[in-house]
Amino acid sequence: MDLSSLEIFRAVAHEASVTRAAQRLQRAQSNVTTRIRQLEEDLGVELFLRDGKRMSLTERGSEFLAYAEQLLALADEARQSMHPAEPGGRLRLGSMESTAASRLPALLASYHKACPRVALEVSTGTSHALFDGVRARRLDCALVAAGPGWAGELDGSGLRGEPLFREELLMILPAEHPPVHDVAEVRLRTLAGFARGCTYRQLAEDSLGTPLTVQEVGSYHAILACVAAGACVGVLPRSVLQLLGTPPLRSLPLAEVDTWLVWREGYATAAFERWRGVLGQAGD
């Protein structure tokens, strides 16, 4: 087992395909297949279930992926530590959809200009999923929303964090809904929102109370479309609403929520520290 084998295994696991993994790694497909087979023989377990061209992780494969991610992350940290004055290597950044849409583009452009040798990998998800991703070393750092009791979540988690931005969270309602001045006046009992683990959704659920039906969608465009259709309410930051532009809707201030940067305690590569600097300048 070597780092090259782990990189190949991770690529196949993420792509669920030998063909796509080979393209991503710029390797021959036969080489990828052989290396996966050799790794399985070395470990004495089956890592993948084969269904035609689709590759899905077995239970043991999922367990091994967590270790592979940690080993590869540590190896990358070790490489970067040898050249602290020249940020390079890889930085795996997690972000909420709202931050990725409204704030990240300009920040990533500034960072790439300052650190062109760093390969940035950006993925999006709910705050809960991103928090877990950093803790499990699938991500190096993440931008998450700080909900109620946030400070307590960091205690004993092995993670550190710092606040960056404050977002004004709005509840949006169909244009035909009667004017409201308080959440208690909202008549609709269906909420369009992201999957569980989204801090904004949780704040909306807590404010609206029960009974409440949640219609899970995958994007802010979908939330806006559902609300405009008149069947439900939604929540999103004002910055996203201004960015996307909307059909005529009503809006109601719901809360102010801080966006935090979180990372593993002790993680301090040159690439990450430069990223913290870019974020700090934007948050000032």
From Swiss-Prot:
Q: Which GO terms describe its molecular function?
A: DNA-binding transcription factor activity; transcription cis-regulatory region binding
The GO biological-process annotations, alphabetized, read as: regulation of DNA-templated transcription
Name the UniProt key words of this record, in alphabetical order.
Answer: DNA-binding, Repressor, Transcription, Transcription regulation
Looking at the record, the residues that make up the HTH lysR-type domain are: 1-58
- DNA-binding positions are 18-37
Question: Is DNA-binding tagged as a keyword?
Answer: yes
Gene inactivation effect: The PA1225 gene, encoding a quinone oxidoreductase, is the most highly up-regulated gene in cells lacking NmoR.
What InterPro entries does its record include?
LysR_subst-bd, Tscrpt_reg_HTH_LysR, WH-like_DNA-bd_sf, WH_DNA-bd_sf
Q: Name one Pfam family in it.
A: HTH_1
Q: Of which family is this protein a member?
A: Belongs to the LysR transcriptional regulatory family.
Q: What does this protein do?
A: Represses its own transcription and the expression of nmoA, a nitronate monooxygenase. The nmoA-nmoR intergenic region is the sole direct binding site of NmoR across the P.aeruginosa PAO1 genome. Other genes seem also to be under negative control of NmoR, especially PA1225 and the hemO gene.
Return the protein name: HTH-type transcriptional regulator NmoR
Organism placement in taxonomy: Bacteria, Pseudomonadati, Pseudomonadota, Gammaproteobacteria, Pseudomonadales
The gene designation is: nmoR
